[in-house]
Amino acid sequence: MDKTWLKQYPAGVPANIDVAQYPSLVALLEESFKKYAGRMAYKFMGKSISFAQIDDASRALAAWLQTQGLEKGDRVAIMMPNVPQYPVAVAAILRAGYVVVNVNPLYTPRELEHQLKDSGAKLIIMVENFATTLQQVLAAVPTKKIILTALGEIGRAHV
């Protein structure tokens, strides 16, 4: 198979990765947060967010998640579009020892119910804009803990 996309890679970017380089995804994140702490990770709504800020926010969220009675390997759903809270939530869930369940924020109530039942997610982190969809299925799903966040905020949420 001709891998035409490799021609687009910048010089020095390998065609393959060494999957044994990191023992876990958390180890990869930890190294990246440390290595790029002073760098901007992204800009959102005119605000720059550094790798250090993502690191700090995800550590705080991971610590809080571990107080919620979940067990290692439990599923935690994330229902967000491409917003700064998403990488914070992913890093926090992984750091806490849980499994990330991505949920399309455009799901209908029927689709959301199916995914939450199928995954067994016990907690969901979501942008408040989509809370009405969850509200319609909450009685039928195993997900009983909800963290709401708003567009443009990072580092605080409503539980």
Per-region residue spans from a language model:
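Conserved AMP-binding/adenylate-forming core of the ANL superfamily
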Residues: 20-21, 38-83, 87-91, 108-113
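Structural core segment of the AMP-binding/adenylate-forming
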Residues: 67-68, 95-158
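Short, contiguous pre-domain boundary segments
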Residues: 6-16
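A short N-terminal helical cap/helix-turn-helix that marks the beginning
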Residues: 2-4, 19-40
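Flexible, low-complexity linker/hinge segments
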Residues: 14-23, 154
